[in-house]
A protein has these predicted regions:
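Hydrophobic-ligand binding "helix-grip"
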Residues: 31-36, 53-99, 109
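Hydrophobic ligand-binding cavity/cleft-lining segments
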Residues: 1-38
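Residue-level preference for beta-strand/loop junctions
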Residues: 2-4, 51, 87
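Generic structural detector for well-ordered beta-strands
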Residues: 9-11, 46-48, 58, 94
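Short coil-to-beta transition motif at edge beta-strands of beta-rich domains
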Residues: 39-47
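Hydrophobic pocket/interface hotspot
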Residues: 19-20, 45, 59, 70, ...
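A conserved amphipathic terminal alpha-helix motif
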Residues: 110-148
Length: 148
């Protein structure tokens, strides 16, 4: 049986271009410290949230207004036994027009129920996409999800 990668979907009234541009500014919706760039193919950036999470992403696929894929090239999840369990996974954003709205399908390929951080990581992604990124797309201002 195929393992189910984590996925969540939002639908907004903004254009695919607006959704695409918001995705490519993770510092405005992914709560934590971000260094580097996510503007174009092969860009790299690091993400850190306190002492819990550090990861490095490289943009490996970018189709304007349609799709963005990040490859996690390094990761340290401090509360997991396998601290590198995100390394080699891919984070995909698929954009599609649907009934005069824009659908964004988020998939973390490799984040499945067998991964130790699945529950906490999938909960965090749900909040980040459904609240943080959604707010950035719909209001122009991202929302900090993890406070304190």
């Amino acid at each position: 049986m195929k393992k189910q990668d984590f996925t969540t979907t939002i639908i907004v009234g903004q254009t695919p271009s607006q959704v695409f541009n918001a995705i490519n500014n993770p510092q405005n919706w992914w709560s934590g410290e971000i260094n580097g760039s996510a503007d174009k193919l092969n860009d790299e950036f690091t993400y850190r949230y306190k002492e819990f999470h550090l990861s490095k992403q490289r943009i490996v696929e970018m189709i304007p207004d349609q799709k963005v894929v990040w490859l996690v090239t390094e990761s340290i999840i401090n509360y997991a036994e396998d601290k590198k369990e995100w390394t080699g996974t891919k984070i995909s954003f698929e954009i599609a027009e649907q009934n005069n709205k824009t659908q964004l399908r988020f998939i973390h390929l490799g984040l499945d129920p067998d991964i130790e951080c699945f529950d906490s990581c999938s909960n965090s992604w749900s909040q980040l996409i459904q609240q943080g990124l959604f707010s950035l797309i719909t209001t122009g201002k991202g929302r900090q999800i993890f406070l304190g």
